[in-house]
Structures are given as structure tokens and as C-alpha cells.
Amino acid sequence: MGMNTSIYRMKNGTLLGVLLCLVALWPSRVCAENSATNPAQMLQKLDESLTQKAQYEQQKLQRIAQLKAQLPRTFDRKRYALLRQLYKEYASYQYDSAYTYAQQMNQMALQLCSQDFHIEAQCAQVFCLLSAGLFHEGVATLQPIDIAHATAPYRKLYFITAARLYYDLADYTHAAPYVGEYIAKGSVFTDSLLHYLPRNSDEWLYASGLQAMKWRHFTASNHYFKQLLSRNHVDAHTRAIITSCMGWTKLFQHEKAAAICLLAQAAIYDNVSATRETTALCTLARLLYEQGDIQRSTEYVRQSLQNANFYGAR
């Protein structure tokens, strides 16, 4: 996942909650206890998980097929809800399909004369664009969104999306003074978002952790992230984002053993949730190459490129 921040896959509902409870809780405990001392153990678990990639993907495709089968006999608000489910299934899986369903959500929102649904559909389009690396188009799509008459949940969604866009833009730019400017913009949107979130809720912890991480307040960010990871109901996709973020902080602090373990854990969660829009595996490959693990590094690069090409990242 991107320093992903999505949240951003953010972030995406709890469709994978049952799967998480069955197969994805143990890595977080292993890594939390042994992240600095057992990277080999986590890499072995990652290799084992990757052998089941086709199985996890088939589960996603079955869910998608079941949703699509309902479309011909579904109308009005129920149809919008179905389009939303299809968008969420594709959001971090395949750009073209995700964007198509985001557009269909927008068309349905206009038919229903729903300002809230219109905002949600526009935010979905922004998420697709930023996930594909189309940042200019993402900003152009975000700017006209009018939340003046939106209800609180959809204002919240707007702030989540805007923060994610500018944080990702900062990661992509890597050049002064723009990095600081984009982080500051993302932080302003995060401050607005936090007003809508109950303190210590899942979303509050994630938003606070991400904001602290972007300002490189790593002790604070990891404190928030660890609290969130300790909650058993958190889905696999969100866990992938959080552990990827924590891996990045350890990498920045030159704690490579801990970074490898956390990134391996993130890659496991990405695999379990059939996420194709991801950076954990690629970053992990680079670290392993530097350590001389050429065979594993080469395989992770191959799979990372396969994921990126399938997703449609630019």
C-alpha cells in the first residue's frame, strides 16, 4: 500500500473483517513482539502467504461476481449502495474498474438528487486518481467539490480524501519547498477531519498517527498506530496500511530489521486482502537486495511489477 495512507485505503469498509479474524490476526502480534529480532521468521510467513495469492484473489472475484449479478434487478438507492460496494472491492485492486464504478456512482447520485452521494462519488474518483498516480487530475477533481450543504459523514469523507491526496502528493514530489507545502495542506484537512471524529476512535487514531508521521513525529505516530493495531476488529486492509506506515518510520530511523518485519507483515495483509495498489513488497525487495538476498528480492520485485501493471498505476 502507498504510505497509505487507504487510508486511505482508508482506507474501505469492513468487507474483509471475517477473513481477518480467521487468518490475519497472528502476524501483528508476532511482529509487535519480535519485529527487531525475527525478520527471517516474518519473511518465511510472507513467502507462505504469497503461495496462497490465487486463493485470496479468487475469494475477491467471487464477491465481485455476486455483486454484479444483482445489478440488473437493483434500482434507486439500493443500486447506488451496490455500486458503492463494487467500487470498494475494486478501489485498491484495479484502477479502471474502480473508476468506472465511481463514475456510475456519480451518475446515480445525480439521478437521486443527493448532494451527499454526489460528494461521495467525487471523492471516490479522487481516490482512484491519486492511487493511480494521476495527482494533477486528482487535484482538479477535488477542487470543485462543494461540502457547504453536506451532512457530517460526507464532510468527514471529503476531509479524509483531501488529506490523503496532499499527503500522497508530498510523497510523490520529494522536492522542497513543495513537500512541506503539500504536507501542510494535508495537515489542515486532517485538523478539520479530527473535529468530526470521537477521540480515540479508530478513525481518530489513524488520522492522528498519519499526521504525526508526515511531520516525522515518529514516536507519537507509532503510539497511535499501535493502539489501532491492538483492536481485533480492524480489517486486513487497514492493518496493511498501518504496518506499512510503521515500517516506513523504522526505515527512516535506520532500524532495518524492524522495518523488514513490519513491511513483510504489511505485504501479508495486502495479500490476504487481495490488494494490488501497494508499495510494501517493492520497498521490502529493495531492503533485501541491499542485504544480498537476491533471490527473494527478485521475486518480490517481479510480483510488485505484476501488481502495479494489474492495478494500472501510472
Q: Which residues does each predicted region cover?
A:
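A "functional boundary" signal
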Residues: G2, I7-Y8, P27-R314
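Bacterial N-terminal signal peptides
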Residues: G17-L25
